[in-house]
Amino acid sequence: MSVKAPITQDVVTIPRKLPEGRINLVGLTRDRMREVLIDHGTPEKQAKMRVGQIWQWIYQWGVRDFEAMTNLAKAYRAQLAEHFTIEIPEVITRLVSEDGTRKYLVRIAGGHEVEVVYIPEEDRGTLCISSQVGCTLTCSFCHTGTQKLVRNLTAAEIVGQVMMARDDLGEWPVPGAPKDETRLLSNIVLMGMGEPLYNFDNVRDAMKIAMDPEGIQLSRRRITLSTSGVVPEIARTAEEIGCLLAISFHATTDEVRDVLVPINKRWNIEELLSALAAYPKVSNSERITFEYVMLDGVNDSDADAHRLLDHIRRYKIPAKINLIPFNEWPGAPYKRSSNNRIRAFANIIYQAGYAAPIRKTRGDDIMAACGQLKSATERARKSKKQIEAETGL
């Protein structure tokens, strides 16, 4: 009997509630921020305006101190400071690769840790963020998959990773200064720790904040969500987020994908392709990215390349195929395909008319490359009662 991957998970999301009882405004939707402001003394008629002002200070200017919000009355600033706070994850370690890649280990509520990676390139700067502490999917080639799932990240902890990186890059604009169109952090990829679609609501709320035109102001075309194939949530992603989609495909037969990406036992290749075919039209995306890690003797044959093309053509999916040389980690059960084999695989796809870039490995000297992320301090799964005790809830 085959093992079914779960549709939902036995995992809790811990809200960011500080010991003194103040509410963290980071991660709240505009509607929720309006509610909490009214609950703590903001006149209802002023609440929408106040949300707009505070929102810009937090997400456009990167301000964390209410006293610095100079377009608010001094008494109101004091009132805000009494009831609210502006908190983001704490950076524990920061490693910089020889190629300029930065890897951050950040601490969140309960003492848990996640990893975040910034990858600078000539024409862009990409931040790879996490959505869960650990992961439940146990993809056999992925280092994160060896770390037990502890919990989902809150919307504050997800968008807080973006804010933390902007802090480190010194990229918050200064009010009144000339606008600089050059952005060091121009793209977000949800390709860090965890399966984003198993934490849909928090990921959606965080990305809505990142895309807000009065805040961080990233276009949805600059945000890519990578999923292993949580089929029921793919349509929701198109409708409610509308960002670009990448699929961790990695195999062309169910037999191999069941091993590499075990969620395939729940939603097989045909079910996945059917869901992917509808995504571009609903989300207005030009194409879907197929991520394909190259494993020596496992999924890298010419026959695999032709099967991959057959899948894409059969479902008429506008696609780009990202070929990823396997980044080895201690105890990994696979080896990287040879450069010649990867190039031959890419050439078959390219000759068929599809883009097939070979991803340049970045940050592997600091274990920041694709598939290498894992918290330095690993935590086992905890019960809701244990987590609540840790966080003082």
From Swiss-Prot:
Cofactor(s) this protein requires: [4Fe-4S] cluster
UniProt entry keywords in alphabetical sequence: 4Fe-4S, Cytoplasm, Disulfide bond, Iron, Iron-sulfur, Metal-binding, Methyltransferase, rRNA processing, S-adenosyl-L-methionine, Transferase, tRNA processing
Cofactor remark: Binds 1 [4Fe-4S] cluster. The cluster is coordinated with 3 cysteines and an exchangeable S-adenosyl-L-methionine.
Locations listed in the record: Cytoplasm
Biological process per Gene Ontology, one example term: tRNA methylation
Domain Radical SAM core: 121-365
Swiss-Prot/TrEMBL catalytic activity: adenosine(2503) in 23S rRNA + 2 reduced [2Fe-2S]-[ferredoxin] + 2 S-adenosyl-L-methionine = 2-methyladenosine(2503) in 23S rRNA + 5'-deoxyadenosine + L-methionine + 2 oxidized [2Fe-2S]-[ferredoxin] + S-adenosyl-L-homocysteine; adenosine(37) in tRNA + 2 reduced [2Fe-2S]-[ferredoxin] + 2 S-adenosyl-L-methionine = 2-methyladenosine(37) in tRNA + 5'-deoxyadenosine + L-methionine + 2 oxidized [2Fe-2S]-[ferredoxin] + S-adenosyl-L-homocysteine
Positions of [4Fe-4S] cluster binding: C135, C139, C142
Superkingdom of the organism of origin: Bacteria
EC number: 2.1.1.192
Keyword rRNA processing: yes
InterPro entries (UniProt xref): Aldolase_TIM, Methyltransferase_A, RlmN_N, RNA_MTrfase_RlmN, rRNA_lsu_MTrfase_RlmN/Cfr, rSAM
Active site: E115 (proton acceptor), C370 (s-methylcysteine intermediate)
GO function terms (MF aspect): 4 iron, 4 sulfur cluster binding; metal ion binding; rRNA (adenine(2503)-C2-)-methyltransferase activity; rRNA binding; tRNA (adenine(37)-C2)-methyltransferase activity; tRNA binding
Assigned GO CC terms: cytoplasm
Main location: cytoplasm
Miscellaneous notes: Reaction proceeds by a ping-pong mechanism involving intermediate methylation of a conserved cysteine residue.
Family: Belongs to the radical SAM superfamily. RlmN family.
Cited function: Specifically methylates position 2 of adenine 2503 in 23S rRNA and position 2 of adenine 37 in tRNAs. m2A2503 modification seems to play a crucial role in the proofreading step occurring at the peptidyl transferase center and thus would serve to optimize ribosomal fidelity.
Protein name as it appears in the record: Dual-specificity RNA methyltransferase RlmN
Organism listed in the record: Ruegeria pomeroyi (strain ATCC 700808 / DSM 15171 / DSS-3)
